[in-house]
């Protein structure tokens, strides 16, 4: 039988987790020391007497590790400051850290492990698909959790049942907001009337931004001249980019994560597609995967 968290403990844990999530959302890049500590699996803050166990989870390795490391670093910094100032109601926070490697199944496994270790609240997950998997699992425990970066609307709201996920908090914007605002910027501010889109199919984040960009751009009077997709694991995008080139867009919306975006920008240049590319928050970290001339 799953242990439900009491309302009193829920509110106390949710408060500190929400504060840590806000700090994390404003955080920057990772440090080697913090990454090394996180990779060990569990980092316990100096504790005296009773402790409150808070889980911190993200992709500390893999293709989107820059995001996971930033979340762990920001959350750990804040929680250590809470401990230094006396903790919560005299109790110190013990930080449980897990690397879900950017994988939804692994994320659920990490969540379950931390629950078994006595976690009372979670900071995480980080990217959209793993977060959605953890959200579904966390509801059974009434586990307070806050994500600093997962942008799918379904993280906090179930459209099929028209219900809010009451145990889940978000310290960032949503996919509809990003997609709509970028379409507004492209059409109204930059003056583009013809756009193409390239995105990863089957990925909640990528498809969510693409759909909202397309709908808004067309509603403003713009034309989507082409929509190209690719699959998980693809590294050659020249076919899609050549097709886009033939449709003569003024811009390309590329709502993907930084590593793939870097490859796409490089290959676009090689096929002669030199129009401006636009994207979402998944481009954070792109500097290490694209040249200054491409940015």
Tell me the role of every PLM-derived stretch.
Residues 26-36:
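Bacterial lipoprotein signal-peptidase II cleavage site
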Residues 64-89, 211-216:
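Short, polar/charged alpha-helical segment
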Residues 48, 55-74, 98-104, 126-127, ...:
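Extracytoplasmic "Venus flytrap"
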Residues 66-71, 85-158, 230-235, 262:
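Beta-alpha junction/loop-to-helix N-cap segments that form part of ligand/metal-binding clefts
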Residues 119-227, 276-294:
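Extracytoplasmic ligand/sensor domains, especially the bilobed periplasmic-binding protein
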Residues 128-139, 235-238, 242, 247-271:
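Hydrophobic alpha-helical
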Residues 1-25:
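N-terminal secretory signal peptides
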Residues 34-58, 87-92, 187-193:
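Immediate post-signal peptide segment of exported/extracytoplasmic ligand-binding proteins
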């Amino acid at each position: 039988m799953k242990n439900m968290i009491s309302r009193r403990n829920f509110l106390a844990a949710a408060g500190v987790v929400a504060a840590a999530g806000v700090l994390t959302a404003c955080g920057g890049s990772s440090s080697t020391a913090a990454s090394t500590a996180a990779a060990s699996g569990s980092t316990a803050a100096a504790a005296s007497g009773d402790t409150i166990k808070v889980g911190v989870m993200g992709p500390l390795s893999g293709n989107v590790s820059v995001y996971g490391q930033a979340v762990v670093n920001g959350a750990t910094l804040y929680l250590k400051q809470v401990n230094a100032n006396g903790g919560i109601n005299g109790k110190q926070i013990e930080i449980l850290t897990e690397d879900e490697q950017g994988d939804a199944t692994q994320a659920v496994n990490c969540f379950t492990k931390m629950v078994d270790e006595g976690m009372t609240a979670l900071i995480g997950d980080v990217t959209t698909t793993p977060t959605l998997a953890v959200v579904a699992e966390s509801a059974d425990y009434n586990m307070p959790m806050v994500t600093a970066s997962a942008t799918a609307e379904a993280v906090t709201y179930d459209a099929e049942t028209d219900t809010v996920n009451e145990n889940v908090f978000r310290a960032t914007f949503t996919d509809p907001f990003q997609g709509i605002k970028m379409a507004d910027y492209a059409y109204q501010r930059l003056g583009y009337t013809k756009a193409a889109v390239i995105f990863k199919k089957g990925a909640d984040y990528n498809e969510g931004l693409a759909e909202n960009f397309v709908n808004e751009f067309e509603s403003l009077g713009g034309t989507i001249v082409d929509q190209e997709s690719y699959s998980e694991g693809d590294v050659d995008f020249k076919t899609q980019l050549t097709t886009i080139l033939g449709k003569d867009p003024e811009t390309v919306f590329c709502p993907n994560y930084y590593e793939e975006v870097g490859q796409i920008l490089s290959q676009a240049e090689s096929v002669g597609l030199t129009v401006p590319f636009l994207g979402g928050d998944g481009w954070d970290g792109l500097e290490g995967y694209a040249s200054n001339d491409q940015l």
